[in-house]
Amino acid sequence: MKIQKGTHAPFRLPCLLINPKLLAYRVAFTESCRYDIGVGQGDINKLFGVGYFPHHHDNSVRIGWNYDLVSGKINLFAYWYAEGLRGWHYLRSVDIGEVNYFSIQVREQDHIIDVSGRKYCVDVAGRSVGYLLRPYFGGNRTSPHTMIIDLQKI
């Protein structure tokens, strides 16, 4: 998956999810995922997740990430909106190039995020119809250069 310089995300057609149960991916961040954008460095980029109608800023659950200039690692987060209120929780850091397995399990009352064995429960109720949320760089900043993430559905 490639995010071009000056954009937030690659163009993709929407993907409807009917009775979603599990989103699972094999993920490796490449050297191109290193960046320094100054004051916005702590903003959380989005990797993948599920959004619910009417809009994912109302209810959604995603795995987020950012690059840590000090450690040289990728920080990973649970990232969500619950009834319009945003939340996040740090999960772990991984090395550039390291292969990891990430998943989001959709349950009736909540979601379980699993980042290579580190699990976190997000109190956003699952719904019968949603849509796939794909990689997005930012906050409000666009990608400072082209970034490639090896993201393979499993």
Language model regions located:
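Short tryptophan-centered beta-strand motifs in secreted/extracellular beta-sheet-rich domains
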Residues: 25, 98-114
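Short beta-strand segments enriched in hydrophobic/aromatic residues
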Residues: 27-29, 80, 106
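Secretory/extracellular carbohydrate-interaction modules
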Residues: 1-76
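Short, aromatic/His-centered strand-loop micro-motif at the edge of beta-sheets
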Residues: 77-101
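Hydrophobic residues embedded in beta-strands of well-ordered beta-sheets
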Residues: 72-76, 109-113, 120
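Flexible glycan-contacting loops in extracellular carbohydrate-active proteins
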Residues: 122-154
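Surface-exposed loop/edge segments in extracytoplasmic proteins
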Residues: 86-89, 118-123
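Surface-exposed coil/turn segments at beta-strand junctions on protein surfaces, enriched
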Residues: 18, 95-97, 128
